[in-house]
Regions:
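Periplasmic c-type cytochrome electron-transfer domains
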Residues: 1-257
Length: 257
């Protein structure tokens, strides 16, 4: 597939570990954690950056998905400028004076879009990753398995869509920071840390469209299976059979559902 020039430039930057603007010592690129736009399956400790334990989120399908990260601490893709500087140790894609202007260094401060052509290109590439993969857990003809079909009915009956609703299985999709509602479903613990250095009162609800691919679940990777992640919620107990069926449905939610 031929990429638009801006998207192609962004992809080049995404995979570049040698550009000193992107990382110190040539050891890290965006693709180090997000190869092919996916996730490395690891949990990172961002306590020193005002957050806490955070499992890497895939970038695929996230275009236009509203606030970013588990704590919704970014409101635009260009906010990765701060992570380039603080986490990767890069010099940054925008000039220091532009980054320090007004409240721009604050992830939720003055907009960063339109300041640096290369930063906008990087954002354009990430925004181009707008497709989820199909779930390999479905029947060969693409239909839900019997347990998953029963789990779909449970999903509706138990009100799961109150957080995981809509076309993206995420009620926060497309939300502006002012409209964002973070949810605490009982999974926040001391190791969850903070949000932008302040109290973490909830988690930005993730989409379920690629939950099957996570490898570890919840914001801190503390759940070893989808069933464990569901059981960790404090939203009501489920019997073993219902839990198994609900987990089967979530596992089969991909691009098809």
């Amino acid at each position: 597939e031929k990429l638009a020039p801006q998207v192609l430039r962004g992809k080049q930057l995404f995979y570049d570990a040698l550009d000193v603007r992107l990382a110190r010592d040539g050891y890290l690129s965006c693709a180090s954690c997000h190869a092919d736009g996916g996730a490395d399956g690891r949990v990172w400790d961002f306590t020193g950056f005002g957050e806490g334990l955070r499992r890497t989120i895939s970038l695929r399908g996230r275009a236009g998905n509203g606030p970013l990260h588990w704590s919704a601490n970014f409101d635009e893709l260009q906010d990765f400028e701060g992570q380039i500087r603080d986490f990767a140790g890069g010099q940054g894609l925008m000039a220091d004076g532009d980054f320090a202007f007004s409240t721009r260094s604050d992830p939720l401060g003055a907009p960063k879009a339109g300041v640096s052509p290369d930063l906008d290109a990087l954002a354009a590439y990430m925004a181009s990753l707008d497709r989820f993969a199909p779930s390999p857990w479905r029947n060969p003809d693409g239909t839900l398995g019997a347990d998953a079909a029963a789990g779909k009915a449970l999903f509706a009956a138990r009100g799961c869509a109150s957080c995981h609703g809509g076309a993206d299985f995420d009620v926060a999709a497309g939300a502006s920071p002012g409209d964002l509602v973070l949810h605490d479903v009982g999974t926040i613990k001391p190791s969850s840390g903070s949000r932008l250095g302040s109290a973490l009162v909830g988690i930005d609800t993730p989409t379920l469209r690629d939950a099957w691919a996570a490898g570890a679940w919840l914001h801190d990777g503390s759940a070893g299976s989808i069933g464990d992640a569901i059981a960790a919620h404090n939203t009501g107990a489920l019997g073993a059979e219902d839990l198994r069926r609900l987990a089967a449905y979530v596992r089969e939610i991909g691009s098809e559902e």
